[in-house]
Amino acid sequence: MRIALGIEYDGNGYFGWQRQAEVDSVQAQLERALSIVANEPIGVFCAGRTDAGVHATGQVVHFETNAIRNEGAWTLGVNANLPDNIAVRWVKEVDDSFHARFSATARRYRYVIYNHSFRPGILRHGVSHYHGDIDADRMHQAAQALLGEQDFTSFRAVQCQSKTPFRNVHCVNVTRQGMYVIVDIAANAFLHHMVRNIVGSLLEIGLGNQPLTWMGDLLALKDRNQAAATAKPHGLYLVDVTYPEQYQLPKLALGPLFMLD
């Protein structure tokens, strides 16, 4: 049978989602816990591979198993065998047409900036700290140039392995909640480092170092070297993955938990 899980994790201390030799990863920990509960080797497929230090509140995975277990085993049982910074949030049996990555129609990320003169002690790995005076409205206005299907070469990592730089950004919003500035962006898919590279350039606009038209200019240049530095990983969360209604997967609050939704 094929099982889908909703996963939440704190990416700090992991070398990203993907299983790698000799380093710890979220995938390796999840597969270990699932294999214990299933009493057989389990391999998982995810909706989106997050980088080192990046978090998720809405990651979705699927796996195949011959084990017959109830919902409590796949949630409470797996959680009992996971580190405290990884948690299963929901489980659902799905048909064989479902694939966590290839069935997804959209992914959504939130990047959380703590905009204050002094760095935080609490949540220091859950937010990215920037001390300058950030104009969130200015960032939001500039970000609208990203909408639609476009060539995002200027915002892809040099090591990105995607065959095409084109992605379709469905929506992007930048808002302020007190000392937090949140960049909320959804697209059909994302290039390697695309969200963090976009945030890095939006910050330059928000800090008044670049004009409102800069995002559009960067898209036209198709040159990663012309854009700003990549934003830090700690503020980034994969918060939602969209699938066709036929699969009827559970939907939870987007998170992260300390934000007002």
Swiss-Prot record:
Keywords: Isomerase, tRNA processing. The active site is at 51 (nucleophile). One of its GO terms (biological process) is tRNA pseudouridine synthesis. The keyword Mitochondrion does not apply. It is an enzyme of class 5 (isomerase). Its EC number is 5.4.99.12. PANTHER family: PSEUDOURIDYLATE SYNTHASE (PTHR11142), TRNA PSEUDOURIDINE SYNTHASE-LIKE 1 (PTHR11142:SF0). Homodimer. This is tRNA pseudouridine synthase A. It comes from Shewanella baltica (strain OS195).
